[in-house]
Amino acid sequence: MYKFWGKVQTHNKRGKKLGFPTANIALHQDIPEGIYISKTKVNRQIYGSVTFIGIAKTFGETRFHAETYILDFNKNIYGKWISVKLIKKIRANEKFNSVSELVEQMKQDAKMARKFFAY
């Protein structure tokens, strides 16, 4: 699989508004679009996470980027360096008909990751 790192950037804080605060990182390598179960390293600690790679089609964006939702994590890490290791692709990137449909899928993605990490 893939591994990448970068400084957490402020974007539009949409993930937080949807109940899934994400660490946004600019990508500097070619990684296939999709949603992945991942491990994220922050300040020498490793956390289970779900990572989105691609273009946020539901919101009509054109920017290719990475967003990582770190499970059960609520610290402010804007401007901090993190590394993300993709473990398993769980689905393709897709455009949802509504934001609520996307949120329901995100809940399922997080549930799958929790099961994978057994917590």
PLM regions: where:
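Phosphate/ribose-recognition catalytic cores of enzymes acting on nucleotide-derived substrates
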Residues: 2-119
